[in-house]
From Swiss-Prot:
Record EC number: 3.1.26.8
Cofactor-binding details, from the entry: Binds two Mg(2+) per subunit.
Family per record: Belongs to the ribonuclease M5 family.
Class of this enzyme: hydrolase
Source species of the chain: Listeria monocytogenes serovar 1/2a (strain ATCC BAA-679 / EGD-e)
Residues where Mg(2+) 2 binds: 60, 62
Key words, A-Z: Cytoplasm, Endonuclease, Hydrolase, Magnesium, Metal-binding, Nuclease, Ribosome biogenesis, RNA-binding, rRNA processing, rRNA-binding
Name used for this protein in its record: Ribonuclease M5
One protein family per Pfam: Toprim
Ranges of residues in domain Toprim: 8-91
């Protein structure tokens, strides 16, 4: 017995090195996109996997990874999303950013804290005014706060334009957002 958790869903990753990292961390089947140019064949494979057992999209926390995530989510509704923090996806040496650099513990944590996109039963709406008031849009430190919010809420990093949509997509309530911001403010005061 390996002691590794078993993931029922198929995990969609970008490449072979990501599959290796997943296999060292959990027992799961993966589907590799092999780059950001998603073929129709890959989309069909993901669609079939979603129908069979469900899919968790687990791409790198960078622009190409986010592009792949959006393409899949658009073509195959109802997918689950796992996010790895940017700092956990940095290599020990050299350049790059990716799932393949994350520790087994970080990979397991990301897969345990997935979100499901789609139409939530009760649509959450958080106005831009609230996002500005919480220091997440415009102003000094907004980018850093958005990155921290993404880590706390396990929704990944988003830029200012994407934040409201991401919060709605994963049905994050205003109360959850405010609580996460209070945690960040507490950390900033303690620094």
């Amino acid at each position: 017995m390996s002691g590794k958790p078993v993931i029922h869903e198929f995990i969609v990753v970008e490449g072979r090195d990501d599959t290796t990292a997943i296999n060292r961390s959990v027992i799961a089947d993966t589907i590799e996109t092999n780059g950001s140019a998603l073929s129709q064949e890959t989309i069909e494979k993901i669609r079939h996997a979603q129908e069979l057992r469900g899919v968790i999209i687990f791409t790198d926390p960078d622009f190409p990874g986010e592009k792949i995530r959006k393409q899949i989510d658009s073509a195959v509704p109802g997918c689950k999303h796992a996010f790895i923090n940017r700092q956990d996806a940095l290599p020990k040496a050299g350049r790059g950013l990716g799932v393949e650099h994350a520790s087994s513990a970080n990979i397991r944590e990301a897969l345990e804290n997935f979100h499901t996109s789609g139409a939530p039963t009760e649509k959450q709406f958080i106005s831009k005014d609230i996002l500005v008031h919480l220091g997440l849009l415009g102003g000094v430190g907004a980018k850093e706060r958005r990155e921290k919010i993404g880590n706390i809420l396990k929704i990944g990093y988003t830029n200012g334009k994407q934040l409201q949509t991401r919060l709605e997509s994963f049905a994050i309530s205003e109360e959850q957002l405010v609580a996460a911001c209070q945690k960040i403010m507490q950390e900033e005061e303690n620094e």
